[in-house]
Amino acid sequence: MFISQSKIDDLIASDGAFLDLTTELLRGCADLNAPARLSIVTRQDLIFSGGQIAREVAARFGCETQHLAREGSAFCAGDEIFSARGSFESLHKAWKIVQIVFEYSCKISTYAHEMVALMREANPRCVLGATRKSFPFAKELCVNALIAGGGTMHRLGLHDSVLFFSNHIRAFASFSEFCAQIAKFKERAPERKIMIEVASEREFSELLKYAPDAIMCDKMSPGELRACVLKRDETAPQIKICAAGGINKNNCAEFAATGADVLVSSAVWNQGVCDLGGKIEFI
């Protein structure tokens, strides 16, 4: 995952732009240049992610990363997930920035991993696709964490895919009038997949006649979604079905079992943080 140096600098500036007042008060009482070691330990089972950002932050403070796991690695409560060596003063500047990156990133990758495991148990072909609702100013961290957890991005942004929502369809006098334009949309963007959101079985059935590449069923019950999958299988098996609306770890297996191809979810982005601890010791 490419993360620009300016993003790393912005992250550091948000917490350490000036001086570390607390550590500065120790000057004269302790050797702030003495070599020390920072260790980040997890208090819960997790799927690791965020290592690249942590290493870059540590390096910007002149600290050397000693232990850095592979993205997507599994850790148990009590395991060390990251360590770095540097001066006592520098490690205190890097410490919380690194720990907070891991707290958010690992929570996303862990939750995504748990969802994917539940989905695949119900339907091995079903894919988790996260929405573009990642929290602001942190897309690189969020996307990297999602991938580490086994998920994919449903959409990175407006630029990378075609998805007609009901708000787009209101530009037409009727749903049927919109559907009649699908062939033209394909001509105008021949290398792109055309996906359309529907909110009812009636709209789904009508849309099947026009052969879009994918249909996103929004806020349907598992029963309604299963009925749509059966209709698709009977008439247009090449069309992919995405399910969206309130899908999370508690219900993803049920939705995956309907036969949907992709479960679209924002749940991975709003699960809080992992429980981690940081310790700095002189060496």
Annotate each language-model stretch with its function.
Residues 223, 250:
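Residues that form or flank phosphate/diphosphate-binding pockets in enzymes
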Residues 239, 245-247:
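Long amphipathic alpha-helical scaffold regions
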Residues 234-240, 283:
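Short acidic, glycine/proline-enriched helix-loop-strand junctions
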Residues 219, 245, 266-267:
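Short secondary-structure boundary segments
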Residues 1-197, 203-210, 214, 226-227, ...:
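Acidic/glycine-rich phosphate/pyrophosphate-binding loops and surrounding catalytic core
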Residues 5, 279-282:
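Short alpha-helical segments enriched in small residues
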